[in-house]
Amino acid sequence: MAAEHLIRFAAGRSKIRVWDAGCARGQETWSLAMILAERMNQYGFRNLKIDATDHDSQNHFGAVVTQGTYSFRELERTPRHLVERYFRTLYDGGREFCQVIELLRQKVTYHYHDLLSLRPVGGNYCLILCKNVLLHLQYEERVAVYRMFHEALTPGGYLATEQTQKLPPEVAHLFEKAVPDAQLFKRVEQLAGRLNQQSVNTISGGTER
């Protein structure tokens, strides 16, 4: 669902940036990359860049995501036709495993990143994914991270979170629901609201004088 909204939103853009915040071993990152490779036109996919990040102090995930290597068991839930199209089979010391093809690997960059730094890894993202991370944060931390995501999104960009994670009321004015049955939100711009409030204040001030 997030991919379909991204494709429509990003049509004609020269830069299409996606941030997978909390990518773990990268399965979600590559699933999204495969979906976009299947459904985007050639121009759009050429302009796609995905930042995959995780707070992985033991560096368990970086090499896995960068190399895109997985066992067949890890890909059991991936549709067979996608595995055949976007993975190649490799052998190492009698061990058989799969590697994401170069076409997709060149679209993804892994970064070590702590969401609680409240410093975005980049900016002007058309889509930010954050699944199975926010639920581990304290309430005040979640509010701060949502504000950071709003800052990192391009105007009108999308934020997708886990289905069980509700938007805190403190940041409800920063996002609007894109669909009724999923946690997919669209960035709301604040400029118009500020200008309207300034106009109200000016009118009120003039009346009092």
Predicted regions and their residues:
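Conserved SAM-binding loop of SAM-dependent methyltransferases across substrates and taxa
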Residues: R25-Y43
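A structural alpha-helix within SAM-dependent methyltransferase catalytic domains
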Residues: A3, A33-A37, H150
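Conserved class I S-adenosyl-L-methionine
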Residues: S14-S31, K49-D51
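A short glycine-rich, Lys/Arg-flanked "PGG" loop and its adjoining helix->strand segment in the class I
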Residues: V143-P155
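Conserved AdoMet
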Residues: M1-W19
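Extended basic-aromatic, gly/pro-enriched interface segments that bind polyanionic ligands
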Residues: Y43-L129, V133-H136, E141, L167
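Active-site micro-motifs of SAM-dependent methyltransferase domains
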Residues: E4, R8, E38, S117, ...
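Class I (Rossmann-like) S-adenosyl-L-methionine-dependent methyltransferase catalytic domain
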Residues: D56-F61, Y86-L90, E96-E102, Y112-G122, ...
